UniProtKB/Swiss-Prot annotation:
One of its GO terms (biological process) is maturation of SSU-rRNA. It is found in: Cytoplasm. This is Ribosome-binding factor A. It comes from Carboxydothermus hydrogenoformans (strain ATCC BAA-161 / DSM 6008 / Z-2901). Monomer. Binds 30S ribosomal subunits, but not 50S ribosomal subunits or 70S ribosomes. The keyword Cytoplasm applies. GO terms for molecular function: ribosomal small subunit binding. One of several proteins that assist in the late maturation steps of the functional core of the 30S ribosomal subunit. Associates with free 30S ribosomal subunits (but not with 30S subunits that are part of 70S ribosomes or polysomes). Required for efficient processing of 16S rRNA. May interact with the 5'-terminal helix region of 16S rRNA. Pfam families: RBFA. Its main location: cytoplasm. Keywords: Cytoplasm, Ribosome biogenesis. It comes from the Bacteria. GO terms for cellular component: cytosol.
């Protein structure tokens, strides 16, 4: 999937991101759906496909259940998206895990550990 860098293309991706985030948070009523956030949308050049990057806060089981819920609600989400964002062709939606927030949290944990370790070493000296 090649991403086109035009301004209109970026605005369309942003509109889809905002609409999908609102639909997931307000309209999807699946109990398997955990705390999720839409972090990014990549659109195919011809708008036939949209990769929707999702960050899930929680355990691996929470992630698995959230993606099952999203994939089972894909048709509903696409229908709601069609009523909110006017496009000639409604893209096929693909939900993809975005580990960047989790990765950032892990880096912060490591930095805090190093900071704590450095403080302990200074007090021993």
């Amino acid at each position: 999937m090649r991403v086109l860098a035009s301004h209109k293309h970026e605005r369309t991706a942003q509109a889809i991101k905002e609409a999908v985030a609102a639909i997931i948070s307000r309209e999807v009523k699946d109990p398997r759906l955990g705390f999720v956030s839409v972090t990014k949308v990549d659109l195919a050049r011809d708008l036939s496909q949209a990769k929707i990057y999702i960050s899930v806060y929680g355990s691996e089981e929470d992630k698995k259940n959230s993606f099952i819920a999203l994939n089972s609600a894909k048709g509903f989400i696409k229908g709601e998206l069609a009523s909110r964002v006017r496009l000639r062709i409604m893209p096929e939606l693909y939900f993809v895990e975005d580990p960047s927030i989790e990765y950032g949290a892990r880096i912060m944990e490591i930095l805090e550990g190093l900071k704590k370790e450095a403080g302990e070493n200074e007090s021993e000296s």
